From Swiss-Prot:
Gene3D superfamilies: Extracellular Endonuclease, subunit A (3.40.570.10). The active site is at H138. Its cofactor is Mn(2+); Mg(2+). The keyword Calcium does not apply. SMART domains: Endonuclease_NS (SM00892), NUC (SM00477). PROSITE patterns: NUCLEASE_NON_SPEC. This is Mitochondrial nuclease. Its EC number is 3.1.30.-. One of its GO terms (cellular component) is mitochondrion. Mg(2+) binds at N170. It comes from Saccharomyces cerevisiae (strain ATCC 204508 / S288c). Present with 3870 molecules/cell in log phase SD medium. The active site contains 1 hydrated divalent metal cation that has only 1 direct interaction with the protein; all other interactions are via water molecules. It is found in: Mitochondrion inner membrane.
Length: 329
């Protein structure tokens, strides 16, 4: 799939309103303060609703309906969780040469677990993935969090997972993309990555109308299976010129399906504004265009095929190898 095909599908699928959770402490991820405040804007003075005894805000005395998004600050990443899809909206990482060089954690000591900070009725369950045909796909990779066991353990919360096709994607091309991101720390002293799911429309061949169609797993069905995933990469402070103020940027959108390792990574590159429209997120809006350089013009945006197979996956006793998913329409 080339970038121009992806662009045709990147239409407005907004993620919703702003965050309603605030962090109390960077290193205390479970200390989250809920602030579901009702709107404070005064009604239009031209509307004389008070004359007719109309007060819609009176509903708030029973509770504010939301939406509520769970913003959590872990050691290695920050995530914003979507209670409706039971997937993250986005996960934000920061990797450096120093963080990747550390070897203070072992994946075999980490286990997939439910995120009990999220209310039970809104969180993914371990049983939801069992025999679903999908991998529990890390959005912040465990391999990026070897600097502490706690950091690595945090990546195994299901709130950091999305259902991903295993063979040909999560265990292959997607893993190669994650390795590409880590490799950027050889040229840049700081690399920031935003990763998340997408639910993009597809043209119906019968009536030529675009529709969003995705599977939902679990019992009862509750976890949405993304059609695509995105990565926004921001590379800072090149080793050759660490004082440089501008940043090198690239955005990629990949389908949640097997991808041949022969496919060029640049085939999945998309403009940032197209990614914004498809996610409803504002990305790098504080950075002037003159300060944003094209990453793929500074480095060779190409995956390096490595044999990830299932070696790392088998190290965790909690991980079950899953059969391939049913083919989506």
């Amino acid at each position: 799939m080339c970038s121009r095909i992806l662009l045709s599908g990147l239409v407005g699928l907004g993620a919703g309103t702003g965050l309603t959770y605030l962090l109390l402490n960077k290193h205390s991820p479970t200390q989250i303060i809920e602030t579901p405040y009702p709107p404070t804007q005064k009604p239009n003075s031209n509307i004389q609703s008070h004359s007719f005894n109309v007060d819609p805000s009176g509903f708030f005395k029973y509770g504010f309906p939301g939406p509520i998004h769970d913003l959590q600050n872990r050691e290695e990443f920050i995530s914003c969780y979507n209670r409706q899809t039971q997937n993250p909206y986005w996960v934000l990482e920061h990797i450096t040469p120093e963080s990747l060089a550390a070897r203070n954690a072992d994946r075999k000591n980490s286990f997939f677990k439910e995120d009990e900070v999220i209310p039970e009725k809104f969180r993914g369950k371990l049983r939801d993935y069992f025999r679903s045909g999908y991998d529990r796909g890390h959005q912040a990779p465990a391999a990026d969090a070897k600097f502490s066991q706690q950091a690595m353990d945090d990546t195994f919360y299901l709130s950091n997972m999305c259902p991903q096709v295993g063979e040909g994607f999560n265990r292959d091309y997607w893993a190669h993309l994650e390795y590409f991101c880590r490799g950027l720390t050889k040229k840049y002293k700081s690399v920031r990555i935003v990763t998340g799911p997408l639910y993009l429309p597809k043209k119906d061949p019968i009536d030529n109308k675009f529709r969003v169609n995705y599977e939902v797993i679990g019992n009862p069905p509750s976890i949405a299976v993304p059609t695509h995933f995105f990565k926004l990469i921001v590379a800072e402070a090149p080793t050759a010129n660490p004082a440089r103020e501008d940043i090198a940027v690239a955005a990629f959108v990949l389908p949640n399906e097997p991808i041949s390792n022969e496919t060029k990574l640049t085939d999945f590159e998309v403009p940032i504004d197209a990614l914004e429209r498809s996610t409803g997120l504002e990305l790098l809006q504080k950075v002037p265009p003159s300060k944003k350089k094209a990453l793929c013009k500074e480095v060779n945006c190409q995956i390096v095929v490595r044999d990830f197979s299932n070696a790392a996956i088998k190290q965790s006793k909690d991980v079950k190898l899953l059969p391939p998913p049913k083919k989506r329409n």
